[in-house]
Amino acid sequence: MTNYFRSNVEAMASYVPGEQPPQGTQVIKLNSNENPYPPSPEALAAIKDIDGECLRRYPEPFGEEFRKAVSQLLGVPCNWVIVGNGSDEILSIVIRACAEPTRKVVYPVPTYVLYRTLTEMQAADILEIPYREYNILPVADLIAAHGSVTFIASPNSPSGHVVPSDDLRKLASELSGVLVIDEAYVDFAEESALNLVQDHENVILIRTLSKGYSLAGLRLGFGVGNPQLLNGLFKVKDSYNVDAIACKVATAAITDQAYKNACVAKVKASRTRLAKDLKQLGFCVWDSQANFLLTQPPQGNAEYLYQQLREKKILIRYFKQPGLEDKLRITVGTDEQNQILLQALRDLLESRD
């Protein structure tokens, strides 16, 4: 076949998401960090209230209704909010707007692998700087890299640790480029870096409704940053990038904080119990402030356990890459799902003895 693609696209690898079985398949799905509980009843009611006029017309181009809801929730002005078709779109917008040919896009590893994919799409240079141990951010090296864009996920994936606020503040103060703080999992954490946005014009904070709000299928996220920074991002975003239904449902979801907080509390309690039970099975379990656990199984058999669990219709995440090949990432499910997983692991470990 004739090669129709740009050289950077031809050379890049595709992003590999967690396995998504067809709807209705009977599996225990603990591989994509989805919330095990349903969306807010208010969000579901908003879907039923959609009328034909909403679908006939183009949506409001900036998601104004949702921007106002975020403004009220976080206590920031409305013009400090940008809305995207999932938080991944906002990551892509930042790279399109800010990555320069003469300066690298920089981030610590291991982290969210989509940063590499999105950067390669734009043919920008990449500098990956290893974490020291699993949770010690290489602050000085990140600053010395002089990146046009620096990505920091906090809580990080796949580790689940929160980056200390002092480290983020130092980066915000000393980086000459844009600092993107990806808070996709912040609903399950004890702290946020939101205050840095108001103090530093080069910082954008990015969040999603996929995790804490159980709306991964909706595809809606948002960023918070200085209006001067956002105005540059608006220049390169797609027109009508967020559909009207998504905005209405998302607005209903984030105004129902009581429901979200109750679901998050259940996930956090289950996270604690699951970590304890995995340790009793001989797993090394890293401290997590996300809705998943990074684990190292006994006997160095991560890939074996992943494959055997898959045959039992239990999906978890295995990353065949340096530093992670002996580890498994497990999404926190309901207590019932977690117990089924634990029993399957007990059986598999006993069969290997």
UniProtKB/Swiss-Prot annotation:
The keyword Transferase applies. One of its GO terms (molecular function) is histidinol-phosphate transaminase activity. Pathway: Amino-acid biosynthesis; L-histidine biosynthesis; L-histidine from 5-phospho-alpha-D-ribose 1-diphosphate: step 7/9. CDD domains: AAT_like (cd00609). The lineage of its organism: Bacteria, Bacillati, Cyanobacteriota, Cyanophyceae, Nostocales. It catalyses: L-histidinol phosphate + 2-oxoglutarate = 3-(imidazol-4-yl)-2-oxopropyl phosphate + L-glutamate. The keyword DNA damage does not apply. The modification N6-(pyridoxal phosphate)lysine is found at residue 211. It comes from the Bacteria. Homodimer. It is an enzyme of class 2 (transferase). Its cofactor is pyridoxal 5'-phosphate. Keywords: Amino-acid biosynthesis, Aminotransferase, Histidine biosynthesis, Pyridoxal phosphate, Transferase. It comes from Nostoc sp. (strain PCC 7120 / SAG 25.82 / UTEX 2576). GO terms for biological process: L-histidine biosynthetic process. Belongs to the class-II pyridoxal-phosphate-dependent aminotransferase family. Histidinol-phosphate aminotransferase subfamily. This is Histidinol-phosphate aminotransferase 1. Its EC number is 2.6.1.9.
